[in-house]
């Protein structure tokens, strides 16, 4: 039996980052993972999907915008090659995780870990046998799993993101349950490769957690792409008939049958809390079946922490990473900075145009009683967007009229996810719109749209 200062359960973005930070701070550290080193993100999520999205964007340019760019002639698009590239990208990043573990002298334990008690982890090793490890501190980073539409199950043709992203073959048609980030990203990729795509969303609009103006714009762009989006529509049943899947939906009390070769379930994620012996460690769950934590990621058991999707605060890879740093620094007794209101952290959907946001929507800000000022600048008035060939979308900023501080930012446009850090930095350190407007932005860049909105918040946009 080996003892460590810190044992991390799960090697996803949160887990491996927490392990690295703990080791950097001089703590003996082990990390336990049965399958996906780097987590869903590196293996079958964020990273390979971005490779596929880039391929899909190029297909879009060659099929929809070829004439505008002076491109002519016959071009073929091989999804199999795009798939192979996505796997190569993923495998390279996973190799990087193992390199970082070795570099930081972190012990890798390949197996499935469960708590035997509050200071012991029992690991069923992948190569057979078991190993017990004891620890002073543990960090739980077990991630999440796809929620299924109630009353349905998976089958050969009813799949999650994992099966779909690992498929080298494309269906002729697909129904996607859920118009969140995963549903919209897969919809973009598959439609550009010629798949007939229908997205079904239970709530009144696509990307329902985004600002209403954002949803309206992205629905318009997807309609131009040829994707059918059915909002305020409930999936009642899914029947896999082998060669065809039948999905029964209802809207306004009227039932309809949809048919496709495949169905992708993408309605959300549930924290992975079952099968890890949390009860034996005394770790408590919230009413939402996530692990409850404080601002330092501590559970109700003082030396056990929980980070990432499993705590349910904001299920995004970069949030897990940031939480992992906070947990490791807290364990080491080092100075740290808590993340504060998780609504103020950045989030993005990587179809083209991108959707990127942080903070409160305009409606949320009004509902919370703020005296709201809003500025909105379209990319049709941005020179770089025209040069890129995609002036769709806008920047919309929401601020507190009394103090001039940002409450939220909502962007749609080409690669606008890259613009978020300036906004979240400004919000984090309470910079005002007046102060931000004086920050000189490089010309020509998409970021000039931010500067225009900063000016707009204080009453004087320049180029619109």
Curated annotation (Swiss-Prot):
<feature type="disulfide bond" description="Redox-active">
    <location>
        <begin position="41"/>
        <end position="46"/>
    </location>
</feature>
<keyword id="KW-0520">NAD</keyword>
<dbReference type="GO" id="GO:0006103">
    <property type="term" value="P:2-oxoglutarate metabolic process"/>
</dbReference>
<keyword id="KW-0843">Virulence</keyword>
<keyword id="KW-1015">Disulfide bond</keyword>
<comment type="function">
    <text>Together with AhpC, AhpD and DlaT, Lpd constitutes an NADH-dependent peroxidase active against hydrogen and alkyl peroxides as well as serving as a peroxynitrite reductase, thus protecting the bacterium against reactive nitrogen intermediates and oxidative stress generated by the host immune system.</text>
</comment>
<dbReference type="InterPro" id="IPR036188">
    <property type="entry name" value="FAD/NAD-bd_sf"/>
</dbReference>
<keyword id="KW-0285">Flavoprotein</keyword>
<dbReference type="Pfam" id="PF02852">
    <property type="entry name" value="Pyr_redox_dim"/>
</dbReference>
<feature type="binding site">
    <location>
        <begin position="266"/>
        <end position="269"/>
    </location>
    <ligand>
        <name>NAD(+)</name>
    </ligand>
</feature>
<dbReference type="GO" id="GO:0004148">
    <property type="term" value="F:dihydrolipoyl dehydrogenase (NADH) activity"/>
</dbReference>
<dbReference type="GO" id="GO:0045454">
    <property type="term" value="P:cell redox homeostasis"/>
</dbReference>
<dbReference type="GO" id="GO:0016209">
    <property type="term" value="F:antioxidant activity"/>
</dbReference>
<dbReference type="InterPro" id="IPR016156">
    <property type="entry name" value="FAD/NAD-linked_Rdtase_dimer_sf"/>
</dbReference>
<dbReference type="InterPro" id="IPR006258">
    <property type="entry name" value="Lipoamide_DH"/>
</dbReference>
<feature type="binding site">
    <location>
        <position position="317"/>
    </location>
    <ligand>
        <name>FAD</name>
    </ligand>
</feature>
<dbReference type="GO" id="GO:0045254">
    <property type="term" value="C:pyruvate dehydrogenase complex"/>
</dbReference>
<dbReference type="GO" id="GO:0015036">
    <property type="term" value="F:disulfide oxidoreductase activity"/>
</dbReference>
<keyword id="KW-0560">Oxidoreductase</keyword>
<dbReference type="InterPro" id="IPR050151">
    <property type="entry name" value="Class-I_Pyr_Nuc-Dis_Oxidored"/>
</dbReference>
<keyword id="KW-0676">Redox-active center</keyword>
<dbReference type="GO" id="GO:0070404">
    <property type="term" value="F:NADH binding"/>
</dbReference>
<keyword id="KW-0963">Cytoplasm</keyword>
<dbReference type="Pfam" id="PF07992">
    <property type="entry name" value="Pyr_redox_2"/>
</dbReference>
<feature type="binding site">
    <location>
        <begin position="33"/>
        <end position="41"/>
    </location>
    <ligand>
        <name>FAD</name>
    </ligand>
</feature>
<dbReference type="GO" id="GO:0006090">
    <property type="term" value="P:pyruvate metabolic process"/>
</dbReference>
<comment type="similarity">
    <text>Belongs to the class-I pyridine nucleotide-disulfide oxidoreductase family.</text>
</comment>
<keyword id="KW-0049">Antioxidant</keyword>
<comment type="subunit">
    <text>Homodimer. Identified in a complex with AhpC, AhpD and DlaT. Also is part of the PDH complex, consisting of multiple copies of AceE (E1), DlaT (E2) and Lpd (E3), and of the BCKADH complex, consisting of multiple copies of BkdA/BkdB (E1), BkdC (E2) and Lpd (E3).</text>
</comment>
<dbReference type="InterPro" id="IPR012999">
    <property type="entry name" value="Pyr_OxRdtase_I_AS"/>
</dbReference>
<feature type="binding site">
    <location>
        <position position="309"/>
    </location>
    <ligand>
        <name>FAD</name>
    </ligand>
</feature>
<feature type="binding site">
    <location>
        <position position="201"/>
    </location>
    <ligand>
        <name>NAD(+)</name>
    </ligand>
</feature>
<dbReference type="GO" id="GO:0016655">
    <property type="term" value="F:oxidoreductase activity, acting on NAD(P)H, quinone or similar compound as acceptor"/>
</dbReference>
<dbReference type="InterPro" id="IPR001100">
    <property type="entry name" value="Pyr_nuc-diS_OxRdtase"/>
</dbReference>
<dbReference type="InterPro" id="IPR023753">
    <property type="entry name" value="FAD/NAD-binding_dom"/>
</dbReference>
<dbReference type="InterPro" id="IPR004099">
    <property type="entry name" value="Pyr_nucl-diS_OxRdtase_dimer"/>
</dbReference>
<feature type="active site" description="Proton acceptor">
    <location>
        <position position="443"/>
    </location>
</feature>
<feature type="binding site">
    <location>
        <position position="113"/>
    </location>
    <ligand>
        <name>FAD</name>
    </ligand>
</feature>
<dbReference type="GO" id="GO:0035375">
    <property type="term" value="F:zymogen binding"/>
</dbReference>
<feature type="binding site">
    <location>
        <begin position="178"/>
        <end position="182"/>
    </location>
    <ligand>
        <name>NAD(+)</name>
    </ligand>
</feature>
<protein>
    <recommendedName>
        <fullName>Dihydrolipoyl dehydrogenase</fullName>
        <ecNumber>1.8.1.4</ecNumber>
    </recommendedName>
</protein>
<dbReference type="GO" id="GO:0005576">
    <property type="term" value="C:extracellular region"/>
</dbReference>
